[in-house]
Amino acid sequence: PVFSGVGGGLTQGARSSYMSLFAEAQGSLGVVLNGPTPLETVQEVCQVVDIPVISTVTSKYTEIDEKLEAGITIINISAGKETAETVKYFRERYPKLPIIATGGPTEESIRETIEAGANAITYTPPSNGELFSRKMEKYRKIEKNDQS
């Protein structure tokens, strides 16, 4: 994977550090810590890897200054329906900080998140099953129209 999740919620401390080292050794370009990661874990992970350490932000109320001082270099905003607003909030306060954000389910929400200041968007594409289902539905409509 490009980025590897290395804990922060249930998994903390040395275990997150070891996972970060393994991820780096396997070619990950960055490691991601969950929102509730304790500062001590952030510090440990930042000390053991040379790749970017990314911290997940879940709302505009998330405190990030100490984590930035510890070595976080990118934030990953995942604030549900408030993602664009949260991106805007952090972009205004940290104009040069790289921000990755979830874009939401529509082109409009993705565009809104980019316009709010996200540098990159994470997106989960439809599964093969979903794509196949859509294709089959089109075939059924064509057949139905041909019979009418």
Say what each PLM segment does.
Residues G5, S28-P38, P52-E63, T73-K81, ...:
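Catalytic beta/alpha-barrel core
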Residues A23, V45-C46, E66-K67, F90, ...:
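Generic structural signal for hydrophobic
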Residues S28-P38, I77-T86, A116-M136:
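Glycine-rich phosphate-binding active-site loops on the catalytic face of alpha/beta enzymes
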Residues Q26-G27, V48-V49, A70-G71, Y94-P95, ...:
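Short, structured coil segments at secondary-structure junctions
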Residues E44-C46, I114, S127-S148:
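C-terminal helical cap(s) of enzyme catalytic domains, especially alpha/beta-barrels
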Residues R15-F22, T62-A70, P105-I121:
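Catalytic cores of alpha/beta
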Residues P1-L29, I51, E107-E108, N128:
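Conserved N-terminal beta1-alpha1 strand-loop-helix module at the mouth
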Residues P1-G7, C46-S55, R91-T102:
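Short beta-strand/loop segments at the ligand-binding rim of alpha/beta enzyme cores
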